[in-house]
Amino acid sequence: MRAREKLPVLWLALGDFLRSEGKEEQALEAYAHGRRSDGRLESREGRVCLMRVCWASVARGVLGEEDVRNAVLWLREACACQDGELASEEGVKILRAVMGVYEERGGGEGLELCKELEKYSDVGVREEVAVWKRRFEKEMSVSMDCSE
């Protein structure tokens, strides 16, 4: 393993240590460094760092545009790589937060994301995605009916 490939591992370990010491802000900075050190999110550790950054935004109850973009990126990569973190409590809450934002926007983006996430192997996540997909489809059909 080359030194560059080890960076996400080191940042994740540092972030986890700082979090265990109650230093949440410093941990979040370490996770952000871990995410940036794995630009293409090729490593599990880089994806976990991004998940922890997304989770911090969800836990604060504030999702800005960049937070939504990061969360969607993480959801897509976690699904593509079949990361178990997507099925974790934090992962499902990130999923729900993003879908909630997309629901407020009208559902089109959410429906597209649901189609991608249907490929994830965990039954619980697929069921959650199916619920959101039905909501978006219903919302889209109602908005189509209203436009006529």
Which positions does each model-derived feature cover?
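TPR repeat positional signature
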Residues: 11, 47-55, 95, 114, ...
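Structural motif corresponding to the intra-repeat A-B loop/turn of tetratricopeptide repeats
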Residues: 21, 57-65, 104-105
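Alpha-solenoid helical repeat scaffolds
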Residues: 32, 73-76, 115
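Short coil turns that delineate tetratricopeptide repeat
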Residues: 5, 39-41, 83-89, 122-123
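Residue-level recognition of tetratricopeptide repeat
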Residues: 16, 52-60, 100, 135
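Start-of-helix signal in alpha-solenoid helical-repeat scaffolds, especially tetratricopeptide repeats
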Residues: 8, 44-51, 85-92, 127
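Conserved structural position within tetratricopeptide repeats
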Residues: 1-2, 32-36, 79-80, 119
